[in-house]
């Protein structure tokens, strides 16, 4: 397996993580470099770790994972995406029911809410769930690496770096999109996650291939 093939594989595996990173950037306000760095580290780290686990597990484990990996990704992404949409709609209803208060109080509440939302979106638990969901494919691919006679250390470093860079940029790009979508940012982010989950499910069940064959 050539370096070029490994790089292309890395880009392919990183696409879901990149899309989720864009969704993260959309739902966050005033993204800081450390926010993008945290997301990139989680996604890049898991994208490198999963192939290593798969490589160590062997061919037998590959058959086991392939049977349900798409369902795991679909359920995790669908749940997180649905939760984001539900919370966004709930917040919108609550805002309509609130009595008008002074502009200064509103600004303080918005800042408090933004800080609380940032902590939730960037929590280790939240990022771990998303990182696992978007790196399950890498686990299955990693199993095949065991039979290709390649340097697994070099391979996972390349894959990890590619994912890290793409996800860092994804968060920044997402923030710019968030300025456009404004109040609908979290709904858009949730929809993106659900669509990614559906895409993974359709690809692995062969439905997309049948539709375009």
From Swiss-Prot:
MF terms (GO), sorted A to Z: manganese ion transmembrane transporter activity
Location within or outside the cell: Cell membrane
Superkingdom of this protein's organism: Bacteria
InterPro entries reported in the protein's UniProt record: Mntp/YtaF, Put_MntP
Major place of residence: membrane
Transmembrane intervals: 3-23, 36-56, 67-87, 130-150, 152-172, 187-207
Record GO cellular component, one term: plasma membrane
Database matches in Pfam families: Mntp
Keywords tagged on the record: Cell membrane, Ion transport, Manganese, Membrane, Transmembrane, Transmembrane helix, Transport
Membrane topology reported for the UniProt record: Multi-pass membrane protein
Function: Probably functions as a manganese efflux pump.
Protein family (similarity comment): Belongs to the MntP (TC 9.B.29) family.
Name of the featured protein: Putative manganese efflux pump MntP
Protein species of origin: Clostridium perfringens (strain SM101 / Type A)
Gene: mntP
């Amino acid at each position: 397996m050539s370096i070029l093939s490994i790089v292309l594989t890395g880009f392919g595996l990183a696409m879901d993580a990149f899309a989720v990173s864009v969704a993260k950037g959309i739902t966050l306000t005033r993204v800081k470099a450390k926010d993008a760095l945290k997301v990139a580290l989680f996604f890049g780290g898991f994208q490198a770790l999963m192939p290593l686990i798969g490589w160590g597990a062997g061919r037998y484990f590959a058959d086991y994972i392939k049977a349900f990996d798409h369902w795991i990704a679909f359920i995790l992404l669908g749940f997180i995406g649905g939760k984001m949409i539900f919370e966004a709609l709930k917040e919108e209803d609550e805002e309509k029911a609130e009595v008008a208060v002074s502009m200064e109080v509103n600004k303080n509440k918005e800042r408090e809410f933004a800080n609380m939302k940032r902590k939730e979106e960037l929590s280790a638990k939240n990022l771990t769930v998303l990182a696992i969901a978007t790196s399950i494919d890498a686990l299955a691919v990693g199993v095949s690496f065991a039979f290709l006679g390649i340097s697994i250390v070099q391979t996972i470093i390349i894959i990890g770096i590619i994912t890290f860079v793409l996800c860092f940029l994804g968060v920044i790009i997402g923030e710019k999109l968030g300025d456009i979508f404004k109040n609908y940012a979290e709904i858009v982010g949730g929809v993106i996650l659900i669509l990614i989950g559906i895409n993974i499910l359709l690809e692995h069940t062969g439905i997309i291939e049948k539709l375009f064959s």
